[in-house]
UniProtKB/Swiss-Prot annotation:
EC identifiers of the protein: 1.2.1.12
Protein location: Cytoplasm
Name the UniProt record assigns to this protein: Glyceraldehyde-3-phosphate dehydrogenase
Site-annotated residues for Activates thiol group during catalysis: H185
Source organism, top-level taxon: Bacteria
Active site: C158
Binding site for NAD(+): R12, I13, D39, R84, S127, N320
Pathway membership, UniProt: Carbohydrate degradation; glycolysis; pyruvate from D-glyceraldehyde 3-phosphate: step 1/5
Originating species: Mycobacterium tuberculosis (strain ATCC 25618 / H37Rv)
Catalytic reactions of this protein: D-glyceraldehyde 3-phosphate + phosphate + NAD(+) = (2R)-3-phospho-glyceroyl phosphate + NADH + H(+)
GO cellular component: cytosol; extracellular region; peptidoglycan-based cell wall; plasma membrane
InterPro entries registered for this protein in UniProt: GlycerAld/Erythrose_P_DH, GlycerAld_3-P_DH_AS, GlycerAld_3-P_DH_cat, GlycerAld_3-P_DH_NAD(P)-bd, Glyceraldehyde-3-P_DH_1, NAD(P)-bd_dom_sf
Length: 339
């Protein structure tokens, strides 16, 4: 059955999700159709930003408008909505939408996201950490907990999707006692181009000119997908002046001592086995630009593994936009199978 999707919020994640879907459709791995997108931006601007992207380049198909309410992408047509009144006012039932990808960043708690269900959708996937959701899923880590009964689902954050596979391999193979992480993260639209007011006075500073320390909920969110690690991990983010391509540095105390070679071997086995497609293993001395448009959630850099006694440090890269958007497509596919 083709899963019919509505996108609420056609910004960076909404558009990246759609491009990732097109890529997976070409590979024959996604039986998903986007039937509508809701955004208060005018349609000509939405079509232009879908066609031309500073990171992903030009979309290799025609993008245009049909009438005043349809965006045409190749042979596909997307009903363009501009509903401001909130999720409950959207015509998902009339459009036969099965799953809504909620990517505005505004409706991340269950009470607000439930409006999509009231409007006729069967499931809601929130493209961010959420509050009071039915379940948070990190693919490859706890997707086996999805049983079809959960209706409001969080795809966690891009950083949690990178961190969780690292934590899973280390905890499964050696046991994690406790740990700290840092994500060196590309800037995002939540930061300022120039110095200006912001509730976070570090994010108030010019994103392209500074390394900006700030918070991340990724480490604490691990407890949502790996309950045995609740309260055992913490950390923060350093936002840096690049548009995409981030890296997570995780240092943990292990229950069982392991050498660098043993740790790397465990990650290589996981990348070739149970986490294939989620975790990637690299021997090469790569830098951030090398992983842009890589669809994996977590790209393990074996050359950066360090060990002192029972303490281990591992590093994994991730395209915080493209990798995450591909997991959104995968999660829509997973949820669609339960409909």
């Amino acid at each position: 059955m083709t899963v019919r999707v509505g996108i609420n919020g056609f910004g960076r994640i909404g558009r990246n999700f759609y491009r990732a879907l097109l890529a997976q459709q070409e590979q024959g791995t996604a039986d998903v159709e986007v039937v509508a997108a809701n955004d208060i931006t005018d349609n000509s601007t939405l079509a232009h930003l879908l066609k031309f992207d500073s990171i992903l380049g030009r979309l290799p198909c025609d993008v245009g408008l049909e009438g005043d309410d349809t965006i045409v992408v190749g042979r596909a047509k997307i009903k363009a909505l501009a509903v401001r009144e909130g999720p409950a006012a959207l015509p998902w039932g009339d459009l036969g939408v099965d799953v809504v990808v909620e990517s505005t960043g505004l409706f991340t708690n269950a009470a607000k996201a439930k409006g999509h269900l009231d409007a006729g959708a069967k499931k809601v996937i929130i493209s961010a950490p959420a509050t009071d959701e039915d379940i948070t899923i990190v693919l490859g880590v706890n997707d086996d907990k999805y049983d079809g009964s959960q209706n409001i689902i969080s795809n966690a954050s891009c950083t949690t999707n990178c961190l969780a596979p690292l934590a899973k391999v280390l905890d499964d193979e050696f046991g994690i006692v406790k740990g700290l992480m840092t994500t060196i993260h590309a800037y995002t639209q939540d930061q300022n181009l120039q110095d200006g007011p912001h509730k976070d006075l570090r994010r108030a500073r010019a994103a392209a000119l500074n390394i900006v320390p700030t918070s991340t909920g990724a480490a604490k969110a691990i407890g949502l997908v790996m309950p045995q690690l609740k309260g055992k991990l913490d950390g923060y983010a350093l936002r840096v002046p690049i548009p995409t391509g981030s890296v997570t540095d995780l240092t943990v105390d292990l229950s069982t001592r392991a050498s660098v070679d043993e740790i790397n071997a465990a990650f290589k086995a996981a990348a070739e086995g149970r986490l294939k497609g989620i975790l990637k293993y690299y021997d090469a001395p790569i830098v951030s630009s090398d992983i842009v448009t890589d669809p994996h959630s977590s790209i393990f850099d074996s050359g950066l593994t360090k060990v002192i006694d029972d303490q281990a440090k591992v590093v994994s890269w991730y395209d915080n936009e493209w990798g995450y958007s591909n997991r959104l497509v995968d999660l829509v596919t997973l949820v669609g199978k339960s409909l």
